[in-house]
UniProtKB/Swiss-Prot annotation:
Single GO MF descriptor: glycine hydroxymethyltransferase activity
Name of the protein described by the UniProt record: Serine hydroxymethyltransferase
Function summary: Catalyzes the reversible interconversion of serine and glycine with tetrahydrofolate (THF) serving as the one-carbon carrier. This reaction serves as the major source of one-carbon groups required for the biosynthesis of purines, thymidylate, methionine, and other important biomolecules. Also exhibits THF-independent aldolase activity toward beta-hydroxyamino acids, producing glycine and aldehydes, via a retro-aldol mechanism.
Signal peptide: none
Recorded name of the encoding gene: glyA
EC number: 2.1.2.1
Source organism of this protein record: Trichormus variabilis (strain ATCC 29413 / PCC 7937)
Pathway: One-carbon metabolism; tetrahydrofolate interconversion; Amino-acid biosynthesis; glycine biosynthesis; glycine from L-serine: step 1/1
Pfam families, per the entry: SHMT
Length: 427
């Protein structure tokens, strides 16, 4: 009789096995609308849960500090080659443990403490690692931030240029965590060249769309590109550094190891290789196109129901609901949808009067439920469920109806039907 990994876990540690089982059930029973989350394939899960977790492999393929890396080298080289092919890059480093680690390695390569960086303000849709004062990027470097136009809630490249000319940053950062519109990398490169700055594109949210040719490509215009490998790319949680400059790539490699990390997580790198291989298949482009269409369907229905969206819509996988028009906070909206088994997150909106712990926005995304097979009709229904819940916050009857409709959708599109952990759910 063949024993599975879950059998070993159940026998060894039923408490952890039970909690994993509960998390699996939660993922199955909820509409996952967090824009930065997705469901990776069973093949990626298998790679991450393999014996590769046992192996130390400091260094790069063919140049390790440990013996016994002959198979690890082949796996990591496949991941590198697939990443380069997927994004059209001259160089790829697949070792960063996260997007934040990837960004830090770029800073270590291009900057010295005290240099100036320029990125989008976190409250307008930027990221912690783009100069937030609570992050090392905001502690080690001088920081100036740009935002979106108050009128359009979109990037104003003339304003960004004026700020860059005034501040003269050494590094200009584009790419965001909560910006629903297309980014013009060519315009950013023009601004960077005019002030003598390096240009970094952090495409963590849109990497899958870029790889599918459904968002402009940053590689021809940016000195360095970083991304996570989950989100729209649908791989394991991790980071990736790309560049069109092979010589710069060598410096970036040294900033990853030994500059900022030790041994790479080769089981995760194997998962990245599998995910990159999946993304190179024609079906992935169809998936990415559906992600965009589903986001538009959700956005359109929310607007049809009278809810305000930041920038009045979306070009990618995410949208921000501005709840000020219905006199509600993001914290309250997050709680309301959570009560009917919809997972989202409160988020600041541009020029938000609320604190980051309260916010005036709700961020929604389409990647995860698109992975489960849902299309525009289902996302239109999701829009109606969200609107019904937010516009009737005190109605238990509406809440119960919304919860029933969520369950019906989840039942129609099962998640990981092959996965079972045969232990009772813990009390």
């Amino acid at each position: 009789m063949t024993r599975t990994n879950s059998d070993f876990l159940t026998n060894s540690d039923p408490a952890i096995a039970g909690l994993i089982n509960q998390e699996l059930q939660r993922q199955r029973d909820h509409l996952e609308l967090i824009a930065s989350e997705n469901f990776t394939s069973a093949a990626v899960l298998a790679a991450q849960g393999s014996v590769l977790t046992n192996k130390y492999a400091e260094g790069l393929p063919g140049k390790r500090y440990y013996g016994g890396c002959e198979f690890i080298d082949k796996i990591e080289q496949i991941a590198i080659d697939r990443a380069k092919q997927l994004f059209g890059a001259a160089h790829a480093n697949v070792q960063p443990h996260s997007g934040a680690q990837a960004n830090f390695a770029v800073f270590l390569t291009l900057l010295a403490p005290g240099d100036k960086i320029m990125g989008m303000d976190l409250s307008h849709g930027g990221h912690l690692t783009h100069g937030s004062p609570v992050n090392v990027s905001g502690k080690w470097f001088q920081v100036c931030h740009y935002g979106v136009s108050q009128q359009t809630e979109q990037l104003d490249y003339d304003q960004i240029r004026e700020l860059a000319l005034r501040e003269r940053p050494k590094l200009l950062i584009c790419g965001y965590s909560a910006y629903p519109r297309i980014i013009d990398f060519e315009k950013f490169r023009s601004i960077a060249d005019e002030v003598g700055a390096y240009l970094l594109a952090d495409i963590a949210h849109i990497a899958g769309l870029v790889a599918s040719g459904l968002h402009p490509d940053p590689i021809p215009y940016c000195h360095v590109v970083t991304t996570t490998t989950h989100k729209t790319l649908r791989g394991p949680r991790g980071g990736l550094i790309l560049t069109g400059d092979a010589e710069l790539g060598k410096k970036l490699d040294k900033s990853v190891f030994p500059g900022s990390q030790g041994g790479p997580l080769e089981h995760v790198i194997a998962g990245k290789a599998v995910a990159f291989g999946e993304a190179l298949k024609p079906e992935f482009q169809g998936y990415s196109a559906q992600v965009i269409e589903n986001a538009r369907a959700l956005a359109n229905q929310l607007q049809n129901r009278g809810l305000k969206l930041v920038s009045d819509g979306t070009d990618n996988h995410l949208m921000l609901v501005d709840l000020r028009s219905v006199n509600m906070t993001g914290k309250r909206a997050d709680q309301l949808v959570s009560e009917v088994n919809i997972t989202a997150n409160k988020n600041t909106v541009p020029f938000d009067p609320q604190s980051p712990f309260v916010t005036s926005g709700l961020r929604l995304g389409s990647p995860a439920m698109t992975t489960r097979g849902m299309g525009e009709a289902e996302f239109t229904e999701i829009g109606n469920i969200i609107a019904d819940r937010l516009l009737n916050p005190d109605s238990d009857t509406v809440a119960q109806d919304c919860k029933r409709r969520v369950a019906a959708l989840c039942d129609r599109f099962p998640l990981y039907p092959h996965l079972e952990i045969p232990v009772p759910v813990l009390a």
